[in-house]
């Protein structure tokens, strides 16, 4: 099971197996740096494979369309290219990758395993690589967007001096570069690189929690001041409202992705193994469901994006009618 392969890849493997992976490209259990997928017991997870495969097959097209709309409206409208929206577009691009690459390869993996009791190394590598890039970008960007909101609340008007769209765009590109690099370093089959990758995820998740707690304190203070009839500037109120919107998006991300991270931490640091491989499939699927849910939360909470999409959809429909 690739779920098991994904999250147990942090275990150390003997040098003999590592050196012969390339020569045995298509033998069960031998696929470069990925560990044995335990195909000999695939029948134990056949039902879960089918259910999670169907769930992801249904949600994948929606994730593609919804996140593509988010990326399109933000990238095509300068008025929407604020620092926070650029980071939201980065998150949407990550979710778009899930719909285009990760979920289809997951579905192929599950159905092939059920049909043949074996999945080729190419499919396993495609799924694993896409998964780790997506997961790393998501957690890193969550921290970045949380930091951006905290700076907006702390520095007020000076915020625009420190945080500019161009700088944020460069940061988003750097986030993608670093996570692609970390994923590529897995090919070294070195436990140190894998540990660094996992430690990075954990670090950014912890940073996100700390920052969101600080933001919550600021928002609570702001609401108390309103009750005491000490109104703040309209700019301040707008930043607080946007911080609440971003916090909602972050909360949804964490709820759906935390189970996967906990399983990974359990393997790496506690060396625990969950007997039912089905659990891995469900935690992965929960993370993928978030890629379809997140654009809905974004559209619901961010009025400017919701309005832009409402304007774009009729135009796209008219264009499609003209083509026909």
Protein language model features and the residues they cover:
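Extracellular N-terminal segment of 7TM GPCRs
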Residues: 1-65
């Amino acid at each position: 099971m690739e779920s098991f392969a994904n999250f147990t890849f942090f275990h150390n493997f003997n040098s003999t197996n590592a050196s012969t992976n390339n020569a045995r490209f298509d033998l069960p259990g031998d696929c470069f740096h990925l560990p044995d997928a335990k195909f000999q017991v695939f029948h134990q997870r056949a039902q879960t494979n089918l259910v999670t495969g169907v769930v992801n097959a249904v949600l994948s097209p929606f994730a593609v369309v919804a996140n593509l709309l988010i990326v399109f409206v933000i990238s095509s409208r300068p008025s929407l290219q604020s620092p926070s929206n650029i980071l939201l577009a980065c998150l949407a691009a990550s979710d778009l990758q899930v719909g285009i690459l990760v979920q289809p390869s997951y579905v192929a993996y599950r159905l092939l395993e059920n049909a043949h009791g074996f999945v080729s190394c190419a499919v396993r590598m495609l799924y694993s690589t896409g998964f780790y890039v997506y997961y790393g970008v998501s957690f890193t960007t969550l921290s970045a967007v949380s930091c951006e909101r905290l700076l907006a609340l702390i520095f007020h008007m000076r915020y625009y001096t420190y945080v500019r769209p161009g700088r944020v765009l460069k940061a988003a590109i750097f986030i993608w570069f670093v996570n692609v690099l970390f994923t590529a370093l897995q090919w070294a089959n070195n436990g140190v690189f894998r540990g660094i990758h996992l430690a990075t995820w954990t670090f950014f998740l912890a940073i996100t929690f700390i920052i969101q707690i600080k933001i919550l304190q600021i928002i609570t203070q702001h609401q108390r001041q309103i009750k005491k009839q000490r109104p703040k500037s309209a700019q301040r109120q707008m930043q607080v409202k946007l911080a609440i919107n971003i916090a909602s998006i972050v909360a949804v991300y964490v709820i759906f992705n935390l189970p996967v991270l906990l399983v990974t931490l359990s393997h790496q640091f506690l060396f625990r193994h969950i007997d039912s491989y089905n659990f891995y499939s469900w935690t992965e699927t929960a993370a993928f469901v978030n890629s379809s849910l997140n654009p809905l939360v974004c559209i619901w909470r961010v009025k400017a994006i919701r309005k832009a999409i409402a304007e774009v959809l009729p135009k796209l429909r008219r264009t499609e009618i003209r083509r026909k």
